[in-house]
């Protein structure tokens, strides 16, 4: 017997978040046709029933994934996504990239791990007071290095292996992240607007990926799923 999908969002919530507004009809990807309800005033309107189903499938997947002890990497570097991506990843104890995708983050993870270790070691030395034994210029140089590394790697601290999944806001913008995840066989959950190619995405959530409220709603639901999965794992280990 197939397990019923969790119903985690209502049509009303989606409407209030503006999730149904796609891109102008002349800027669409024909592969998104199954997810489009109609066109109004030259704008594609997303079929929100498909959004409900897509989010439910993604929620179930993320819950099961985190219940196995896997982690999710939230990715959203466009301005309107940065805050929600960071806050929801932190709230749910997951990882995030919200500034710039560094090429090789997934496909050259050994190098990324070395950079993360360097950042961790420098912060440890600073917190231990080791910098006090250096000249002012040397200490300032290392502080600047910490700031620089944090700018890129703050959301990846503690990530010692590849994530079990990536959650992407706007796969068109995050094309490199999509390519790397596909290459590494990492499942992709994504908010997919009418101008995107849904083919590389394992869990398509058809949705306006430009509206801040819509982004926050979706990131929040994926974070809730991760929290639920983590809670299940903790309960099973008691």
From Swiss-Prot:
Ribonucleoprotein as a keyword of this entry, yes or no, is yes
Gene3D superfamilies from the entry?
Glucose-6-phosphate isomerase like protein, domain 1, Helix hairpin bin
Which UniProt key words apply to this protein?
Ribonucleoprotein, Ribosomal protein
Q: Name one GO cellular component term.
A: cytosolic small ribosomal subunit
Q: Biological process GO terms, please?
A: translation
Single GO molecular-function term?
Answer: structural constituent of ribosome
- Say if the entry is tagged with keyword Transmembrane helix: no
Superkingdom in the source lineage: Bacteria
The family classification in the record reads: Belongs to the universal ribosomal protein uS2 family.
The protein's name: Small ribosomal subunit protein uS2
Q: Native species of this protein?
A: Chloroflexus aurantiacus (strain ATCC 29366 / DSM 635 / J-10-fl)
């Amino acid at each position: 017997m197939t397990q019923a999908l969790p119903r985690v969002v209502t049509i009303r919530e989606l409407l209030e978040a503006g999730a149904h507004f796609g891109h102008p009809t002349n800027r669409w990807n024909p592969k998104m046709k199954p997810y489009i309800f109609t066109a109004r005033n030259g704008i594609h309107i997303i079929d929100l029933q498909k959004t409900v189903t897509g989010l439910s499938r993604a929620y179930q997947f993320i819950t099961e994934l985190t219940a196995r002890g896997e982690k999710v990497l939230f990715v959203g570097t466009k301005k309107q996504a940065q805050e929600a991506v960071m806050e929801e990843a932190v709230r749910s104890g997951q990882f995030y990239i919200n500034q710039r995708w560094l090429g090789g983050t997934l496909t050259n993870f050994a190098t990324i791990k070395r950079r993360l270790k360097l950042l961790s070691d420098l912060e440890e030395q600073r917190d231990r007071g080791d910098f006090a034994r250096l000249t002012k210029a040397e200490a300032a140089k290392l502080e600047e290095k910490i700031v620089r590394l944090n700018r890129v790697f703050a959301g990846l601290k503690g990530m010692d292996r590849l994530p079990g999944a990536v959650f992407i806001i706007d796969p068109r913008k995050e094309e490199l992240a999509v390519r790397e995840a596909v290459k590494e066989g990492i499942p992709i959950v994504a908010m997919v607007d009418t101008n995107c190619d849904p083919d590389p995405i394992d869990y398509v959530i058809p949705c306006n990926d430009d509206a801040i409220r819509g982004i926050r709603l979706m990131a929040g639901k994926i974070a809730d799923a991760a929290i639920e999965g983590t809670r299940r794992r903790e309960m099973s280990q008691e």
